[in-house]
Amino acid sequence: LVDTTTGEVVSDDSGDLLFDLSTAWWDLHREGAPDLYPLNRRNSTDAWDKWIGSQINVGHAVATHSKDPEKAAAAANGVLVGFDVIDTLLARATRMEASREDGLTMLDGPALSAVIAIGQYLCGDKPTGSDIRLFTTVQSYEYGGRQHYPGGEAPSISFWPALARWFRALEGRSGWVGPEERSALGC
């Protein structure tokens, strides 16, 4: 968030911004704008956000930027297991076959309050802030980040069919990814 009078960055914490925009500034939303933090899904959204932050977002940053090969490898493995978990949960919620469910434990997944709300998207049938948080990291992973994982190349998201379907559905939504972002990513 940038102060337009000074040009200074006021906040760069997307979680705080999303919370503020969805609560305190709700009256300023354009008509038809999605509710990214719906009241009836806040427990689920909060649980997903906590898990995505620690398991996926931080792990991806460490996997792609750590100078310590052991830390990078452990973080990359955590992200890939996280993708297994999300793929399995999305597959089960949308009646797809879960591809790697057999190797997962209850310790691998998010809190139960996150899992009970899952539908086509992480917290039901409409995208929420949790989908945004995961989407940005999956997007970074798919369009270049995976090439920086230990070993030189991690699998494309097509390796996780339900995750790939979720990603492509969001990527194709009107207004979700702008033309400038598409150009920068080479899509």
Task: Write out the residue ranges for each language-model feature.
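C-terminal alpha-helical interaction module
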Residues: 2-187
